[in-house]
Amino acid sequence: MSFELTPIPVNDDILDAVASGSYYSPHSVLGAHLGDDGVTIRVVAHLADAVDIITPTGAYAATHERGGIWVAALPGKEITAYRVSITYGEDTIVRDDPYRYLPTLGEMDTYLISEGRHEDLWKVLGAHVKTYTDELGETTGTAFAVWAPNARAVRVVGEFNYWDGTQTSMRSLGSSGVWEIFVPEVGVGARYKFEIQGPGGNWFEKADPMARATEIPPATASVVTDYFHEWTDQEWMQARRERNVHDGPMSIYEVHAGSWRQGLGYRELADELVPYVKQMGFTHVEFMPLAEHPFGGSWGYQVTSYYAPSSRYGTPDDFRYLVDAFHREGIGVILDWVPAHFPKDEFALARFDGTPLYEDPDPLRGEHPDWGTYVFNFGRREVRNFLVANALYWLEDFHIDGLRVDAVASMLYLDYSRKDGQWRPNQYGGRENLEAIEFIQEANATAYRRHPGIIMIAEESTAWPGVTAPTSGGGLGYGMKWNMGWMNDTLRYLSEDPVNRRWHHGELTFSLVYAFSENYVLPLSHDEVVHGKGSLISKMPGDKWQRLAGLRSLYAYQWSHPGKQLLFMGQEIGQEQEWNESYSLDWWLLDQEGHAGVAALVERLNKIYASSPAMWDDDYTGFEWIDASDGDHNLISYLRKGSDDAGNREVVVCISNFAGNPHEGYRVGLPFGGEWVEILNTDSEEFGGSGVVNVGTIIAEDTPWNGRPVSASLRVPPLGAVWLVPASQVR
């Protein structure tokens, strides 16, 4: 006795929705489903002439049911592995079926995503290559998952389906807002996007917010990638976990990867930039944002793919190679991170599922008036999760040693760059963005918990209290903060003609009033050499010699001032032109003696700094004024103090003359008697100076001065700095 098996019936309207790729649960219709009298298998095969289902026990012909959907009823009481044979005219292909696979996200994953607490978000969302094995062999493909809670339907499209998303519509994983599908035979290098049907029924294409690789701009597709790099920095990473970054030197070289030298990718930078930074003595390099951005003129500060290193310079593994190369040379890597805002490009995060999803829906909070960008909705837990996990991603997957967080002030204040009537107070009537504060605290606390030894740095331009105070005490939890006040005051002072500086002496000394209220970085960054501001050397008054001397005195002052220091690329060679991201630095300047001298000075400053705890000990006990009040001579002098690993106390006497004339026999009070030696003089001929130096041993005299028991008479060069140490301290 025989009888014909009947497929499990499905409503025609649902079949039509599935066929068009607009059904929220295609896996409930397509794929294999066990019924009372057998197994029903439905597949999508538009324009096919014939479809067969191949199982371990044989092949079964499918019949065309409706709108490109084919169905077969198989005998049996359990679902087995199968493949699909599809005939188009004279051609037949055999492929695996995306709709026979279970979700690649577990219930715990979707729960944590819904709660905004999935710290490893990049491991479950985005595109991930996976391999499965069954009775018919091995299948490798890519699992796609995207968060789009307000979408009516989502499809993944790419070269693998001829950009026809009706063959690969994704399933909704319930209230999590996640859509998911595993697509067999899609591997590394495949380009893809998501087609999203918004609440209004319109379709639009979006790049993957969690993409870990992208096409080279201006192309905008996401790219499937995987992780193949084998790290060689185990010694560095172990030491990082055990050290406190505050208890050591930190001299940062800020770099724009595309214009340090034009045409270099990540691997070429490993060959050229790494040895250069090593030679110059910087302890860290800080890259301007490398997350993918469509417009090069944004310098990376308008990010569209937060999880993808810019493909302009190579692959994600190429970037890992670069970081690895820095670590092998003992150099830390800091990355600029931009969680404050994102651009309105239609292919990216903006109105991602047809609604304000990543951006704040309130127009008085959701747009940045100065930059024409959207502001993240820090009050939405899934958005906070996206950003917190992003910070962890760079720290974990790329071994980044720190993140410099851009535009923190714009997050903290609801009225930032807004006039009256353009902002709405918080629940207490204040201008503080309480949700942003919570996000910042969460991001910092989580980063330090997951990755001991890293550093989170705030670019925060206001007097917000407790930026570097721990979150446990109500602080924002950053490890360091850019000292914008020091930078502004110092550059304003040095832009004055030396004749007039006596009237601006307070601008030079004011920073020491608050120097120990936070953990500071002293930044001479890219922001000071763009938008018509000129280069650092162009800010100095006088002729070429005076401008070079002024630049050298600035650097000596910066390196000896409490705080860590940061210098933007090109300024170490006295770059004369304002920075332009479209051109390489003017390396030919090193053929000129004066510019080569500036570079030699920066190299010497870093060498002295790294070997002298007195210069990087940022405790308030490590600084003492000798004379802060000699404004008539444009002179300041102070002590830096610290202890080496053996507990030996070190001192460095720092004298800076910002006047255009030298001082012969200038008396300076010293902390104790004995022999002293000059370890740095920015007017030395080797740095391009005029040679007003102190040769040989300097003997402290029993002449009280500056409130000190002894003193010495010195030669102090014009527009120059002198550093002295006890002769016994020279090693």
Q: PLM features: what roles do these ranges have?
A:
Residues 1-36, 64-148, 173-254, 261-264, ...:
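The feature marks proteins involved in alpha-glucan
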Residues 28-33, 37-49, 140-143, 150-152, ...:
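Carbohydrate-binding surface patches
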Residues 41-43, 48-59, 146, 151-166, ...:
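Beta-strand-rich binding/interaction modules
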Residues 43, 146, 194, 255, ...:
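Conserved, mostly hydrophobic/aromatic
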Residues 78-82, 188-191, 696-731:
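C-terminal beta-strand-rich structural cap/linker in extracellular carbohydrate-active enzymes
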Residues 111-126, 130-136, 213-254, 492-552, ...:
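Glycine-rich phosphate/pyrophosphate-binding loop
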Residues 211-221, 227-252, 256-432, 698, ...:
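Substrate-binding/active-site clefts of carbohydrate-active enzymes
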Residues 218, 399-401, 419-584, 589, ...:
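Conserved alpha/beta catalytic core and glycan-binding cleft of carbohydrate-active enzymes
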